[in-house]
């Protein structure tokens, strides 16, 4: 009913507006009238005979009420019309087109073409109002009850929208018929809105009656166009057929038996091959117009499918189907080929844009499949929702886990009721959720410890204060007595649901899920899983929700291991690494399911960023064209957070101590670090120890194999020996490729200075050869190995024998140094000759003496048959003397310098990281 207190003087306005029993709605099979009704103090009950306003004074008073109701006249069949049996079964194809699909004349033509081209024997088409019209109709009601005079012009705008569409679509006769009906409807609506304006209030039945006109008009327009295209078509006002009963707030239950009877009657008078039915609207058993509430048009299509036992219900939208995750949050979400009814229900409950759960119920009764398709991409097959789903990806590969999709709900709070007094006490849960019910809150998820010590549940954040207050009041005595320890609420939470019908029969799904979350450094606050195992639900921090969604989706839907890579320092080693990644990327993805995405490359001046992955075949050109000013923090934030990949690694290919100083922070943020940069591991001991301790207690990894001898597996061998219980006694090796080359070529015919110049010309030395000859680089490698062996040494604790003559250490330029170096050849020649006379050679080595807790870098003599004397070129060599390998130390030998092998060592660390993150070994 529509009721509002008005004064007697206001009645003149009503009487002027409405004459006694004036018809205000005259349309096929629907009647409504306004008539004076008695005015009285008590709000009257709903009239069942039409829309009436009755006037009459019950007693003297300054306040009166207007009462009105809306009813739909149910069509009665003429006895002379022979009853026709309504065929049911798979010959019926149901289509539903939303407001976007019929948003313009061109789109209505497109819909009509789709319907006509459907070769089904019989078709029923459910349509929504044109795009934005439903909102416009609600706005009319809001303006009218707010006594905003602009409601009339707003209604004229709605009429004009439909008139222009009709002019574009219809021929003369059809146009005249439609415009006549439209004009009658608008007159009716103006009268009703005027009544709402005067009363200052609109009841639900009045609102439903007004809003439903959008569907009436779009259905008529589409039916005219289908007939124009040669289709045998009638339109149906579903208020004449669908009967629903209110079922609580914002819900209705279909009355299938009564609806079937009315559908039979309607079809007897309207036999046709194609029916265009209004979505969203229906009637109550008292014939009062109502709506099907949220997602009502989808619900209409599902109900009609059930009434007709249709072969299929197709929901036409503006997306290609149901996605494995929200594509706005996960850019690589895929369209699912199939979903089971249960999977679709679970995903929609947890916020996925699939269907409202109630839409699925009618079709489930008769195993009618629902297909979600894109009207703007007819080539896309869409998603089929049916009894059984198929666990396939787009390329036909079976999903190992049978997980179909992921959905999230944000803006939740987690309430925890905890206490030892809960255990074994019957009725505790009833009391808790009774208090929640009393404040009208909605519980989204429940989790209870098996010890009965605590119950936690999630509610909308907007309701958490009321719930917490109600619980504290309900359990005040238990809290004061200590039987309950707390009623705590944790705001800023989100729910992540993992859905799949076949998860119950697939071992390891939960393990895979939580492993993915752990490796993305995400903390889970609560867990819930039903015995059917259709979904696994976790509660986590809202700020982690999108990252968690990306992490689990990546684990189940992308390559087995997908890693975001950020390259710092695209110099000689960095550029070579990028080339190696480019050449190997496709092979790794195909054979090992490892997907390495370079999301950013930064130098000291410019950086190149990408949302989906840089094309490594032309990164140099793109960086020149689109590079932006370098900023290390912005670079890291982008690589870490601006994409769909959960695991991130920063590869530092510089020799910069400033970059190395960020490693600890990156590891704290869940970013893995790989580097050939020696500065962090050979820097201050306390910083090194903090770095190593952080790595051990977190799920982040710090790999630095290439810091000692490029790509040779020195670090991993050392760690393997220690982890298996061996004890390091001594590590000795030639760790400089430059100095290895120099002493391998320092023979009787060539002075030392000449060999140094040759090494520089060949690219083996640093721009200033003194950086190599000073031995500092070797000392850094020795300190890295010493610390890796458990020795707590500083770089200053390592004595280093410099090969740079004392007088030449202060010379400004490298060129001047090389010019003066020959003056000191005699000293090196004498050392070489002394060694040769003893059957030995000179080698520049680093030594870790673990027994005596020290290290040294020095020029040392070795017998010619010693492995260290057998080197050639720039090879490096290392020998581990341990308790197990004491008499015959294992030796690792190979190239120890050069961009290719150093980049290869870094690449090997990246693949080791991928293996740790789940890639097959």
Curated annotation (Swiss-Prot):
Ligand binding (NAD(+)): 573, 654, 898
Gene Ontology cellular component annotations, sorted alphabetically: chloroplast
Feature: transit peptide: 1-87
SUPFAM superfamilies per the UniProt record, alphabetical: ACT-like (SSF55021), Carbamate kinase-like (SSF53633), Glyceraldehyde-3-phosphate dehydrogenase-like, C-terminal domain (SSF55347), NAD(P)-binding Rossmann-fold domains (SSF51735)
Keyword Ribosomal protein recorded: no
Single Gene Ontology BP annotation: homoserine biosynthetic process
Region feature Homoserine dehydrogenase, mapped onto this chain: 568-921
Pathway membership: Amino-acid biosynthesis; L-lysine biosynthesis via DAP pathway; (S)-tetrahydrodipicolinate from L-aspartate: step 1/4; Amino-acid biosynthesis; L-methionine biosynthesis via de novo pathway; L-homoserine from L-aspartate: step 1/3; Amino-acid biosynthesis; L-methionine biosynthesis via de novo pathway; L-homoserine from L-aspartate: step 3/3; Amino-acid biosynthesis; L-threonine biosynthesis; L-threonine from L-aspartate: step 1/5
The entry's keywords: Amino-acid biosynthesis, ATP-binding, Chloroplast, Kinase, Lysine biosynthesis, Metal-binding, Methionine biosynthesis, Multifunctional enzyme, NAD, NADP, Nucleotide-binding, Oxidoreductase, Plastid, Repeat, Sodium, Threonine biosynthesis, Transferase, Transit peptide
Domain ACT: 417-489, 498-575
Reaction(s) catalysed (UniProt annotation): L-homoserine + NADP(+) = L-aspartate 4-semialdehyde + NADPH + H(+); L-homoserine + NAD(+) = L-aspartate 4-semialdehyde + NADH + H(+); L-aspartate + ATP = 4-phospho-L-aspartate + ADP
Binding-site residues, L-homoserine: 766, 777
Region (Aspartokinase): 88-339
Residues reported in the UniProt entry to bind Na(+): 705, 708, 710, 712
Annotated active site: 781
GO molecular function: aspartate kinase activity; ATP binding; homoserine dehydrogenase activity; metal ion binding; NAD+ binding; NADP binding
Cofactors that this protein relies on: a metal cation
Cofactor note: A sodium ion is seen in the structure; a metal ion may subtly affect the relative position of the nucleotide-binding region to influence enzyme activity, and could increase the stability of the enzyme.
Amino acids binding NADP(+): 573, 605, 654, 678, 763, 766, 898
Region (Interface): 340-567
Matches recorded under PANTHER family: HOMOSERINE DEHYDROGENASE, PTHR43070
Functional summary from the UniProt entry: Bifunctional aspartate kinase and homoserine dehydrogenase that catalyzes the first and the third steps toward the synthesis of lysine, methionine and threonine from aspartate.
Protein family: In the N-terminal section; belongs to the aspartokinase family.
Protein name, UniProt field: Bifunctional aspartokinase/homoserine dehydrogenase, chloroplastic
The species this protein was found in: Daucus carota
């Amino acid at each position: 009913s529509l009721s509002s207190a008005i004064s007697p003087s206001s009645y003149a306005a009503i009487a002027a507006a409405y004459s006694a029993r004036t018809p205000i709605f005259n349309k096929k099979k629907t009647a409504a009238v306004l008539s004076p009704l008695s005015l009285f103090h008590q709000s009257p009950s709903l009239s069942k005979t039409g829309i009436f306003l009755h006037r009459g004074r019950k007693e003297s008073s300054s306040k009166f009420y207007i009462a009105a109701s809306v009813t739909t006249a149910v069509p009665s069949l003429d006895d002379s019309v022979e009853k026709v049996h309504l065929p049911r079964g798979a010959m019926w194809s149901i289509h539903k087109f939303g407001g976007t699909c019929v948003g313009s004349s061109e789109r209505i033509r497109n819909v009509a073409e789709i319907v006509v081209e459907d070769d089904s024997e019989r078709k029923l088409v459910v349509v929504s109002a044109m795009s934005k019209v439903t909102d416009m109709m609600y706005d009319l009601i809001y303006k009218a009850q707010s006594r905003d005079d602009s409601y009339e012009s707003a209604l004229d705008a709605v009429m004009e929208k439909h008139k222009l569409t009709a002019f574009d679509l219809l021929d003369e006769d059809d146009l005249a018929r439609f415009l006549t009906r439209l004009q009658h409807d608008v007159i009716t609506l103006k009268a009703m809105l005027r009544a709402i304006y005067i009363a200052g209030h609109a009841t639900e039945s009045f609102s439903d009656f007004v809003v439903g006109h959008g569907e009436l008009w779009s259905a008529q327009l589409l039916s005219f166009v289908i007939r124009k295209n040669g289709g045998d078509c009638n339109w149906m006002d579903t208020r004449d057929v669908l009967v629903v009963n209110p079922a609580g707030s914002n819900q209705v239950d279909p009355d299938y038996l009564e609806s079937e009877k009315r559908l039979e009657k309607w079809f007897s008078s309207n036999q046709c091959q194609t029916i265009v039915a209004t979505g969203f609207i229906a009637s109550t058993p008292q014939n009062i117009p109502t709506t099907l509430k949220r997602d009502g048009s989808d619900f209409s299509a599902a109900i009609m499918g059930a009434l007709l036992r249709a072969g299929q219900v197709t929901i036409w939208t503006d997306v290609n189907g149901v996605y494995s995750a929200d594509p706005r949050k996960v850019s690589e979400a895929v369209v699912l080929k199939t979903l089971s009814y249960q999977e679709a229900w679970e995903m929609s409950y947890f916020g996925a844009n699939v269907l409202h759960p109630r839409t699925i119920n009618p079709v489930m009764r008769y195993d009618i499949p629902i297909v979600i398709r894109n009207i703007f991409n007819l080539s896309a097959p869409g998603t089929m929702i049916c009894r059984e789903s198929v666990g396939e990806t787009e390329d036909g590969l079976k999903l190992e886990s049978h997980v179909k999709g992921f959905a999230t709900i944000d803006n939740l709070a987690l309430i925890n009721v905890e206490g030892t007094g809960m255990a074994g006490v019957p009725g505790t849960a009833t009391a808790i959720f009774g208090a929640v019910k009393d404040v009208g809150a909605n519980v989204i998820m429940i989790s209870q410890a098996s010890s009965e010590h605590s119950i936690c549940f999630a509610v909308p954040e907007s309701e958490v204060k009321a719930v917490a207050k109600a619980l504290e009041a309900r359990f005040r005595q238990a809290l004061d007595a200590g039987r309950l320890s707390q009623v705590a609420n944790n705001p800023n939470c989100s729910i992540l649901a993992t859905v799949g019908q076949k998860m119950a029969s697939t071992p390891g799904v939960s393990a895979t899920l939580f492993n993915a979350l752990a490796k993305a450094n995400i903390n889970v606050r609560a867990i819930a899983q039903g015995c059917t195992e259709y979904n696994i639900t976790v509660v986590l921090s809202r700020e982690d929700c999108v990252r968690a969604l990306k992490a689990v989706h990546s684990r189940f839907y992308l390559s087995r291991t997908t890693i975001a890579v950020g390259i710092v320092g695209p110099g000689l080693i960095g550029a070579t690494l990028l080339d190696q990644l480019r050449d190997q990327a496709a092979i790794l993805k195909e054979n090992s399911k490892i997907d390495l995405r370079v999301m950013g490359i930064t130098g000291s001046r410019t950086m190149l960023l990408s949302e989906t992955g840089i094309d490594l075949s032309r990164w140099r050109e793109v960086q020149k064209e689109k590079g932006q000013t370098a900023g290390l923090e912005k670079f890291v934030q982008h690589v870490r957070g601006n994409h769909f990949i959960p695991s991130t690694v920063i590869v530092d290919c510089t020799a910069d101590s400033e970059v190395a100083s960020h490693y600890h922070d990156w590891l704290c943020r869940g970013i893995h670090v790989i580097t050939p940069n020696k500065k962090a591991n050979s820097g201050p001991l306390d910083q090194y120890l903090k770095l190593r301790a952080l790595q051990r207690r977190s799920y982040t990894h710090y790999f630095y194999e290439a810091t000692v001898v490029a790509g040779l597996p020195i670090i991993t061998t050392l760690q393997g020996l220690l982890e298996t219980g061996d004890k390091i006694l001594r590590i000795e090796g030639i760790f400089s490729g430059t100095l290895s080359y120099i002493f391998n070529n320092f023979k009787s015919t060539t002075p030392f200075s000449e060999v140094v110049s040759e090494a520089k010309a060949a690219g083996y030395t640093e721009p200033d050869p003194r950086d190599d000859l000073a031995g500092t680089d070797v000392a850094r490698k020795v300190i890295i190995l010493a610390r890796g062996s458990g020795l707590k040494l500083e770089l200053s604790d390592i004595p280093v024998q410099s090969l740079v003559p004392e007088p030449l250490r202060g010379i400004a330029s490298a060129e001047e140094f090389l010019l003066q170096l020959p003056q000191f050849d005699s000293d090196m020649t004498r050392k070489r000759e002394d060694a040769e006379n003893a059957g030995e050679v000179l080698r520049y080595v680093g030594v870790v003496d673990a027994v005596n807790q020290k290290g040294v870098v020095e020029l040392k003599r070795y017998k010619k048959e010693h492995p260290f004397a057998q080197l050639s070129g720039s090879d490096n060599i290392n020998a581990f003397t341990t308790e197990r390998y004491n008499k015959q130390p294992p030796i690792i030998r190979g190239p120890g310098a050069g961009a290719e092998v150093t980049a290869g060592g870094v690449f090997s660390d990246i693949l080791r990281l991928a293996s740790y993150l789940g890639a097959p070994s």
